[in-house]
């Protein structure tokens, strides 16, 4: 059995601070190749996700890593000791990226040829791909079959009498790849069992990896819903692994701020305890670059060494109650977000850009959708709300007042660190923010009342509201200045204040 990585470095653009080796504010091109090497060699991350979704991808990354850092990769075998995993565009959803999907798949045999020359033996450096927006088993079965039949088996095509493709390009390896479903929407996360089981029945892998989204579900349905969906999916995967008799290794996509998962060098131990059953944690850019390298390395080393706990398996009654809580919370959260969409999209334009990303216009492309409105990517969504002193963790929380005692007990058992996450976020509430937004015309008075109810409910839970430290007090003042600058159309100042606040938070969003 190949080693399964405990940590996966990603290219999420949530870092407020730019690393020293980046040549500008945006990490792109050759800098991302350097970043992959840095993650492996300096931070001791086990796996790097190479993102072909929503941006120009460099399919020659393996060749560049070997040629630039040959000594390191001679001693650390790519595909055996450390791992590079492609994140594909989903060809069913991102129509303009279909050929990028094909190009990325076609590059996998090239990486094999490069590695064979480099190591002097057959080494498969890339053999797993991640498919975003997976909604059913057919999605991932199609990707696995596409590689087998349209890439690996093209060597058998006869070009003319007795002349085959393999005579021109050589034999194609690997013959098959593993596909990791990245499950991002509520219905699909609740349907995790059928997605995994359908793939297993069709492909018969010896093990499976499952990628549970944490950011997009939070943006679309609220933080509490996202946590419960993750727990539900982990339970279903754990139960199915026992039934099928194959190991299933879940990955969770977590960022530094509570809304996006709260995995930071300061809070990683709680996150590992929260998400029992998770094998691989994403190490996103804010984790890597907004803390000291020593702190980052220490946290990653601890995650790499920590024993994996068994997932908590939910009983049928617990599953039903969890679904009920999810519906209650989501119904309270979504209407507020729809009302805030214009404000969020306006502020999002002025947040720092850290990666080269092609914005897509389609409903389920990179402009993400919740209900009836368009929203930016999750990172800028979160950053926008923090920048006006309204952390999204707060939104909809008063709906918990509708829960009975049994529902509360199940919630507390399945979201251990709810109060801790809310307390961290609540320090960034600007107590004057709501009245400022209403007076400037950015917030409807009715929605302001709903948000005030959420804040009062937090206080009833024993959560302290508003800034207490020098840094969080400074953050509140900067959010006031940002709102004033926005009103006066002084956009350079808006950008400056947004950047300063992101540095204080140690994450854009």
From Swiss-Prot:
A single MF term (Gene Ontology): magnesium ion binding
Catalytic activity line of the entry: oxaloacetate + phosphate = phosphoenolpyruvate + hydrogencarbonate
Entry's EC annotation: 4.1.1.31
InterPro entries: PEP_COase_arc-type, Pyrv/PenolPyrv_kinase-like_dom
Pfam families according to UniProt: PEPcase_2
UniProt keyword GTP-binding, yes or no: no
Protein's GO biological process: carbon fixation; oxaloacetate metabolic process; tricarboxylic acid cycle
Cofactor entry: Mg(2+)
Keyword Magnesium belongs to the record: yes
EC top class, as a word: lyase
Superkingdom of origin organism: Archaea
Swiss-Prot/TrEMBL keywords: Carbon dioxide fixation, Lyase, Magnesium
Similarity-based family: Belongs to the PEPCase type 2 family.
Biological function: Catalyzes the irreversible beta-carboxylation of phosphoenolpyruvate (PEP) to form oxaloacetate (OAA), a four-carbon dicarboxylic acid source for the tricarboxylic acid cycle.
HAMAP family: PEPcase_type2
Complexes and interactors: Homotetramer.
NCBIfam families assigned: PEPCase_arch
Designated name of the protein: Phosphoenolpyruvate carboxylase
Native species: Metallosphaera sedula (strain ATCC 51363 / DSM 5348 / JCM 9185 / NBRC 15509 / TH2)
Classification of source organism: Archaea, Thermoproteota, Thermoprotei, Sulfolobales, Sulfolobaceae
